[in-house]
């Protein structure tokens, strides 16, 4: 069977179309393209950043087509500078308007076509190239839902507190 891509490698920010996108750090335009396929990125920009001796990239997907008309390869972008806008669903791959932000340590020569999702079986490989973008964004942990307990932890709790005379019906807890 063909395993579906279910692991998201970036962070999505659902905002209105035409919302300005600001650079979280100073950088240089490394690549851009219109990935104009259904359920793809649509207009995409990749910035290259250098912090001390560390080089990494940020990818911005689901932008407006106008964003690509106003940008050039090698263009310097200042910290906090607006450099793009979020696209409409008609131009961003058919998605509800939002910004896809992804941090990438090595583009693997994929540039603007770097994947934003991967198969669960490949999670370890792809997340080694894509650290958590919240380390850059800084949304407080309290803004995220609590992690669900693992199946093993759920089973252990049930075994501890539910009597053997009680039956439960499920394939997996």
Write out the residue ranges for each language-model feature.
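Acidic, glycine-rich catalytic/binding loops that coordinate metals and/or anionic ligands
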Residues: 69, 75-81, 85-91, 95-172
